[in-house]
From Swiss-Prot:
The lineage of its organism: Bacteria, Bacillati, Actinomycetota, Actinomycetes, Mycobacteriales. Residues 53-98 are annotated as: Disordered. This is Uncharacterized protein MSMEG_1276/MSMEI_1238.1. It comes from Mycolicibacterium smegmatis (strain ATCC 700084 / mc(2)155). InterPro entries: MSMEG_1276-like_NTP-PPase_dom (IPR038735). Induction: Constitutively expressed in all growth phases, part of the MSMEG_1276-phd-doc-MSMEG_1279 operon.
Amino acid sequence: MAQLVRDRIPELIRASGRTPVIRTLSDDEYWAALDAKLDEEVAELRAADTRDAALEGGRHRHRGESASGNGIQHGVPPNVALIPSGSTLLTPARSGHV
């Protein structure tokens, strides 16, 4: 089953003596995969039996579905922002940028 990989997962697989099968996605493939993963995480979050299950235990994961969805944000390149509806965007001033 294909998985989006982040962090050091291939390194950890190699360290265990196994060989990961990986490939780098094109930009279009990456965004399509990220979109599909977000749909999957939202469905799991909605399927959580209670608010506590969604935030803490989740139905299928020890860290909760909201944490899984948060992981999607880490896969988004730094020049893209995911902002919840109704939020106020505050952008920190950066040197040379207004």
